[in-house]
Amino acid sequence: MSTQRKAYKNHSKRFSNNSSSSSNNNSSSTELTSLLEMFPDWESDDLSSLLAEHNNILEVVIDLIVNNKVSKWEPIKKEAKNKKKEKENDEFVNVPNTNVTSNNTTHTSSADHGHKLNKYHKEAHPSNSKSKFSSKGPHNKKPNPKFNGKDSSPTAPTTSTSTSTSGATSVPSSNSWAAALSKDGVKVNNKSHKESDSQPETELEPEPEPEPVAQAGEEHEIIIEQTTTVIESTETPTSTTKPVLKEATVPQPKQGSWASAITPKPKSKPRTKQALSGSQEESFESKGQFEQAQEEPVEAIIIEETTTTIPAESISSEETIEQPAQVVLPTSSQPLSSVGVSFGSLSLGDEEKESQPEQTTEEISAPVGEQSQQQQQQRYGLYNNQNQNQNQNRYNQQIYQQQQQHAQQQHAQQQQQQQPQQSQQSQQPQQPQQPQQPQQPQQPQQPQQPQQQPQQPQQPQQQYNQSKQQQQQQQQQYDYYNQFQQSQYPQQGSQTLPGAQFGVYPGMDYSAYNQQAAAAVVSSPAASPAATANYAQYAQAASQPPSSGAQEGNVAAQSPITSQINPNTLQQQVPAAPFGYPYYNYYYNTPFYGNGAGLGAQGGFGNVAAAQGTPTSNSNVTPNSGVNSGFMGVGNTGASQYYGQPNQFGNRYPGYNSYPQPGQAQSAQSGNPSNNQSGSVPASQGEANDSSSASNQAGNPQSQIPQQSQQPQQPGIPQYGGYQQYPQYGGYQDNNQYRGWY
């Protein structure tokens, strides 16, 4: 056994061959003996394999073992225990084994038989012959004696059967430990044993009689051992799982065998064999056949399956078979989900309770699949209904849909067609709101289209704030993207930006910012790019050269920007990147802020100097206002300014067109020479001049970029890391947002 066990089990042994291992054992015999003395709980197989792996260096092996770096093979550990029990069993072998043996032996013997088949393929098949099996009888006893020892006397009748699989020959051995473990089982088996002796190999027939004879207590015990034997048989690959299928009663593996330890303990589905006797035996046979193909090599076990099924009829009430759990899984996954067996109740006491679901499981399994499908359909139906309701709720709660619907009336009426369906419900409850909201939010989104920009200045922030409050109320559930302008392209809707887009950013409330911007704009329209009512006007004012710094000073009055600037309108006009534009500091320009706001618009970053009440935008802005509807409202410079141009301001570095010349740095701060033309303009106007100077050369938006390149000087103001010249933030966000970007 040991050598075969080595070859079969110790996969770790590099010398899987018995011969090689034996030779190694010979060379390391002294080390082996010393190790065996030092570690009596280890088997020679393990120790010899360790020695072989470590070149028979005793110290290394001892170190590994002592430090738990090496562990015994579990099956061998348990077998070592089994050997101890075998010794006990050998002592009991002389006990009247014949009394107990055959009837129960069929169950456990089949399980044990299969179990050892797993361990020892070589011996397992010949085990059908009585001679080999009887010789192996003590080994067969090993796994079961553990279980039986735990099962104690009640289990003994079944355990005694474990050894008897081969036939009456094994019976004495099985009776030995069985007799030791349980004499009650022996008594019952004495009756059955007479029958079983008559039919030791046809064990099928004797079992049904003795098991019905078996007492109820023993029936539970039988169930227990069957579970144990079944556990082993289940785990032994060659062992016929059929007995497992039928006998996989609530497995109570009792540490006895590695198989029991390894086997997941399927207590989930104890089935009474009454149900099994009819439908389950059929299913088991079909499934058993399924597994027979796998485990056919064991013949005696197949016989025993029939035996187990017969006792199932006899013991039907109490032998719970968890087989369905093992069997049902291979057959179909759905019935498992639908199976009535609750995995929570696993105790044997629940067997009877669960026998009904067990019966129903097979009976119901087919309808269960149907029911489960129906349930799924119902669930999906509910889910769909819920989704519809939720979607409707979302849309109901989305002012944006309504805004979008109106904005989309402009942008896409197709979407309206879709949304009215969704929003019709939303509109009906909210129609009282819609007349308000569409008026208010619609307009901010209508201005999304540059054509409606003139309306934008007309809309007060109050409406925006109201709509925004409504939005906030209804943003509790909102479709994330509905918030944003539906214009897929920033050029289109960018002009409504501040309210429609940034105001809506989920994490940020820009309402205060817009208000501040509006206030700041009045004081210094250029100070906040909001002051530049439209990108187009903003950039165009910049693009058009200020006739003089004086004009720039007057620009506030002259520029349509300032005229347009109502704190109400400013909210919409606050230059901001179209939706989704990152808020980064672009290396050249932040496209939609400061410089970027009109990108050619005002010298450096939205020149702060302009903040002093002179919007840098010139009266010239209005002639370009037609362009406002153009790209980003900066119709002139168009995309070129939309993206920061490396040379746009004559220098890659945004704040100072060229490295600030000392004169410019002074003048930039004192007052940037607008393109050095209005160099004397006070700093407040100076930056405005810078931007305007940029706009001077940008008089033609096309020319702006080269002109800017011509004006390396624009904002002498070195707008270094501080970027404090971003008026567009109205002081709202100082330097902090740019801190990380160097």
Swiss-Prot record:
Residues 681-700 have a biased composition (Polar residues). It comes from the Eukaryota. Keywords: Chromosome, Cytoplasm, DNA damage, DNA repair, DNA-binding, Nucleus, Telomere, Ubl conjugation, Ubl conjugation pathway. Residues 1-14 have a biased composition (Basic residues). Residues 1-30, 79-494, 642-742 are annotated as: Disordered. One of its GO terms (cellular component) is nucleus. Residues 79-90, 110-125 have a biased composition (Basic and acidic residues). InterPro entries: CUE, DEF1_CUE. Ubiquitinated. Proteolytically cleaved by the proteasome in response to transcription stress; the resulting N-terminal form constitutes the activated nuclear form and the C-terminal portion is degraded. GO terms for molecular function: DNA binding; ubiquitin binding. Residues 16-29, 93-109, 152-176, 224-241, 299-324, 336-348, 371-494, 663-680, 701-733 have a biased composition (Low complexity). It is found in: Cytoplasm; Nucleus; Chromosome, Telomere. One of its GO terms (biological process) is DNA repair. Residues 27-70 form the CUE domain. Pfam families: CUE. Residues 198-210 have a biased composition (Acidic residues). The keyword Ubl conjugation applies. Homodimer; may form higher order oligomers. Interacts with the large RNA polymerase II subunit RPO21; the interaction is direct and serves to bridge RPO21 to the Elongin complex in a manner dependent on transcription stress. Interacts with RAD26. Belongs to the DEF1 family. Recruits the ubiquitination machinery to RNA polymerase II for polyubiquitination, removal and degradation, when the transcription-coupled repair (TCR) factor RAD26 fails to efficiently displace stalled RNA polymerase II. Also involved in telomere length regulation. Binds DNA. This is RNA polymerase II degradation factor 1. The gene is DEF1.
